[in-house]
């Protein structure tokens, strides 16, 4: 479910033209006393996210626990309806080369990105087989110190003033019945 949402959102992010390298869902890892964001590379290992000096990149990560609650179903009293809330964070690093005014570039860019990814959720609803799917921005930061302290710990973070750093918080809310979750229990597994 979440991978389909991230793929859909990344297509919309790519269309903005701001970001060269749009990564999928990352995790904050702790290794040897250091905390940093990393992407799973499908070889049973995580690769640290390295900011591209020449371009720009973004990645998504869950910013908290997913909550699921049962809700009253106003359209069908006998079917169970669920409300799933996924807190997401979009973190990015974008070159300012085309900015006319670097003082307002970061805020304008965040507002543009929010406008692009939070519109037309009908496609997302259809992909998820959900009754309703909404992505709502809950806030953003363009303060590189705050972003660095949220994403890294015990790592010397070297700021690049040629780039804008941003972090946007979202809540993904999905209203669905059990069809939205089908397929997750069908994955092969072994007990042993």
Language model feature labels by segment:
Residues 1-18, 79-83, 128-192:
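Short, charged interaction patches at domain edges and termini
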Residues 74, 103-105, 181-185:
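Surface-exposed beta-strand edges and their flanking turn/coil or helix-capping segments
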Residues 57-59, 88, 166-168:
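A broad, low-specificity signal marking well-ordered, structured residues that form hydrophobic/aromatic
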Residues 18-38, 107-115, 167-178:
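Short N-terminal helix-initiation segments at or just after the protein's N-terminus
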Residues 77-125:
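Extracellular/virion structural assembly segments
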Residues 1-76, 131:
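Small/polar-rich, solvent-exposed N-terminal microdomains that initiate assembly or binding
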């Amino acid at each position: 479910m979440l991978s389909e949402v991230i793929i859909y959102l990344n297509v919309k992010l790519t269309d903005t033209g701001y970001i060269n390298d749009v990564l999928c869902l990352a995790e904050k890892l702790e290794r040897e006393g250091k905390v940093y964001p990393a992407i799973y590379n499908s070889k049973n290992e995580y690769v640290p996210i390295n900011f591209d000096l020449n371009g720009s990149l973004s990645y998504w990560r869950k910013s908290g626990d997913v909550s699921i609650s049962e809700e009253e179903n106003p359209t069908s009293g006998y079917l169970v309806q669920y409300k799933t809330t996924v807190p997401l964070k979009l973190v990015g690093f974008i070159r300012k080369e085309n900015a006319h005014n670097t003082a307002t570039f970061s805020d304008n860019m965040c507002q543009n990105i929010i406008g692009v990814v939070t519109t037309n959720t009908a496609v997302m609803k259809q992909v998820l087989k959900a009754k309703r799917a909404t992505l709502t921005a809950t806030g953003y930061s363009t303060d590189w110190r705050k972003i660095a302290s949220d994403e890294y710990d015990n790592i010397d973070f070297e700021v690049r003033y040629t780039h804008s750093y941003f972090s946007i918080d979202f809540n993904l809310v999905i209203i669905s019945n059990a069809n939205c979750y089908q397929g997750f229990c069908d994955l092969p597994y072994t007990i042993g």
